[in-house]
UniProtKB/Swiss-Prot annotation:
Gene Ontology molecular function, alphabetical: calcium ion binding
Protein name: Multiple coagulation factor deficiency protein 2 homolog
Designated gene of the protein: Mcfd2
Subunit comment: Interacts in a calcium-dependent manner with LMAN1.
Lineage: Eukaryota, Metazoa, Chordata, Craniata, Vertebrata
Binding site for Ca(2+) 1: D80, D82, N84, E91
EF-hand domain: residues covered: 67-102, 115-145
Subcellular location: Endoplasmic reticulum-Golgi intermediate compartment; Endoplasmic reticulum; Golgi apparatus
Record Pfam families: EF-hand_7
Annotated binding of Ca(2+) 2, by residue: D128, N130, D132, Y134, E139
Domain of life per record: Eukaryota
GO biological processes: carboxylic acid metabolic process; protein transport; vesicle-mediated transport
Length: 145
């Protein structure tokens, strides 16, 4: 339970999310959660190569021309599956659990449902400033500061 107290940190800041598990090396896109920190990893949100992989065929702007703010916006839109410009609990869940395996890395054990719920609750509690149950882009961007 004490480790769940650490999940109250700001949404995208631990960062994004610290991706270190003792004895294992893995990277999760969209989440710096390795069972102890919460938020989206800033390095993931700003990872041009990863974002461009997901946006291949969607946008034609060269990645070298994208500002950090444009990368943030594209990252947000990548996880806004219903296109309502808000991230709900389910969209946050998929962002948190979106795992990218690196060659030669060990697989991180899956997060329990209770851990995932606690993280999402913490994100909404800390970053949903208007208490509407969603993270809008302004709240998302502020959580990355």
């Amino acid at each position: 339970m004490a480790s769940l107290q650490l999940l109250r940190g700001p949404f995208l800041c631990v960062l994004l999310w610290a991706f270190c598990v003792p004895g294992a090396r893995a990277q999760e896109h969209g989440a710096g959660v390795h069972h102890g920190s919460v938020g989206l990893d800033k390095s993931t949100v700003h990872d041009q190569e990863h974002i461009m992989e997901h946006l291949e065929g969607v946008i034609n702007q060269p990645e070298a021309e994208m500002s950090p703010q444009e990368l943030q916006l594209h990252y947000f839109k990548m996880h806004d599956y219903d296109g309502n410009s808000l991230l709900d609990g389910l969209e946050l869940s998929t962002a948190i659990t979106h795992v990218h395996k690196e060659e030669g890395s060990e697989q991180v054990p899956p997060m329990s449902e209770d851990e995932l719920i606690s993280i999402i609750d913490g994100v909404l509690r800390d970053d949903d400033k208007n208490n509407d149950g969603y993270i809008d882009y302004a709240e998302f961007a502020k959580s990355l500061q």
